[in-house]
Amino acid sequence: MLVDSYGRVIDYLRISVTQRCNFRCLYCMPKTPFEWSAKENLLSFEELFMFVKVCIDEGVKKIRITGGEPLVRKDLYKFIAMISEYKQDIDLALTTNASLLKQQAKDLRQAGLKRINISLDTLKEDVAFKLAQKNILKDVLNGIDEALNLGFNVKFNTVALKGINDSEFIDLLEFAKVRKSQIRFIEFMENYHAYGDLKGLKSAEILNIIAQKYSFKQGEKSSNAPATIYELEDGYKFGIIDPHSHDFCDSCNRIRLSAEGLLIPCLYYDEALSIKKAIRNKDIAGACEVLKTVIKNKSEKNRWAENEANQSSTRAFYQTGG
């Protein structure tokens, strides 16, 4: 079992398999030109899996594959299969923009993937183009249909942006509701890579919009989950992830691994240690030591809690998966 200095059990690993993304979303990608990491600097699936085995053997029970956009990395399903074959009851999930999901969903399902979180910020083509800087909505919707048809457990994530998609919250909720999938509205997390004129909505503002049509009550919150759950009168449940108002640091159970091998204790801290050298030397004990050191050094609180006046992250979310 992995336990940090504050008694939190760390049993959730998020793996960013690539920095690359086929979208250029305003709230995530830098406006200025930048370069991707060279391929040789990235850990191979075999190298990532070597570390995954270390984590599972030490008590990790949940793994989420993220990016960038994870489906742009070739043969992702093979990595999924490695993990699910090693530990069949592992809670294994994927976060994706769904644009490439129609072509890959069947292979992912056969590899053992059961749960998918899909970023869905709008149902309007022009808004989707504005956000992603390309025509993507048709591919996203086709990917969603394919995932649901194959029986995946699907959740939707919507970043709440003032003046961009706030008029669609009820439509998005109903889109998810009809498909028997949960939607979570996420407060915009300010970061230095987002376009500077973006403004988010706080949880109270999101709830006020939904209350224009629906009555709801607050449900119970899972101790390790970031979302506060609300229930409509007909029993449908949706979530709000509100890091501005309610951090979940006290129950945080996660660490993050970048595609380059950086093990990151907190999304809002720049501190990280690399497992690359140990893994490429096949030094399993060394990799395990890095894991335990990162967990030991995990902060009690994120920097938002320490400095409300400067609520921006310097870390690129496309490198760590948010």
UniProtKB/Swiss-Prot annotation:
Binding, GTP = 14, 64, 95, 155, 254-256
Q: Where is the Radical SAM core domain?
A: 5-217
- Where is S-adenosyl-L-methionine bound in this sequence? 27, 68, 119, 189
Q: Which GO annotations describe the biological process of this protein?
A: Mo-molybdopterin cofactor biosynthetic process
Binding of [4Fe-4S] cluster 2, residues:
249, 252, 266
Gene3D superfamilies listed in its UniProt record: Aldolase class I (3.20.20.70)
Which protein family is it in? Answer: Belongs to the radical SAM superfamily. MoaA family.
Question: What name does UniProt use for this protein?
Answer: GTP 3',8-cyclase
Origin organism is: Campylobacter lari (strain RM2100 / D67 / ATCC BAA-1060)
Which classification does the entry list for the species?
A: Bacteria, Pseudomonadati, Campylobacterota, Epsilonproteobacteria, Campylobacterales
- Give the gene name: moaA
